[in-house]
Amino acid sequence: MKNKFTEYYKLSEKDLKSHWEEDIFCFDANVLLNLYRYSPNAREAFFRLLEQVKDRIWITYQAALEYQKNRLVVINAQREAYKDIRETLGKKKGEIESKLNSFKKHPYLQTTELKKQIESAFDSISRDLDNLENKHPDYLDNDPIWEKLSVLLEGKVGDDFPKEELEKLYRDGKKRYDEKVPPGYMDMKEKQNEGNRSLYGDIIVWKQVIEKAKVVDVSIILITDDLKEDWWYKFKGKTISPRPELIKEFKDETSKRINIYQADKFLEMANRNLAQQTTKEVIQEVRNVRLADEFDIEKEIRELEMLFEDNGDENVKENAKLLVSKRESSFEKAIRNSSEEQNK
């Protein structure tokens, strides 16, 4: 049965080792864009690995295009986050103070003192936020990540499909999406108004990867941080493997086996198969970046509300700051380490 359904089975350690020694490494745009979300240490570790395998790196034209188009969007989103956090903090501060005002006649709540503590806590957080923003690298003006990738990937980007082939791919893509054939169909709602190039971007990447394997007669290790089920087989919330349909389609088209990893797993496997020494802390950070689609300030603010409505504890200011900083999301870590970046 294994010979008939190889897409459902893991490779042996021997076969896997062979792939890592011979295959081409292909990176999706989301992996390249996530480099902006890593701390300097994690980013350097990733670049060290890219340098080691640079002679076997290749990326699709579509992935390179998406990186170029979205690079400034990602950079700007990080800058805009400071503004968004300030607006959210200001809104919640007003709501908390309004709530306290409704208890002015409460016999035990010292609302005036509580309001002073709240004011002090929010002012302290605002000052910290200002300091972090001032230290944040201005990648809009000077982008060393872009420059480094431009050198590293020179001559390693595939050609685009001709217009006629793209038009056919769009027609085939619509049918695939309607039938929920991976990859990409999960983008239907999100990207339906962004034009065919964006809507069918995952399929373009996929077909360009297949064509590359046909031309060079070598298999591919594809690294993507896409989390959706049109790339990954999931069971009861747990990611089991890449979609078997993708592995089968690749084999049917190329007679070869494709291996697909998310960035953190790629680093783990490189430690095992390429004698890399990426630390567990870096791998965990890369994993956190993949899992954190956006900086979730709302959760911290809700916790702040609960804390402020408690009983006027003398340590409220420090506790409030702790709550805001305790969740080590990827974006927070990127901000926190921005001063380290400027000193390099």
Question: What are these regions, as identified by a protein language model?
Answer:
Residues 2-220, 227-312, 316, 325, ...:
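Active-site-proximal, substrate-binding regions of enzyme catalytic domains
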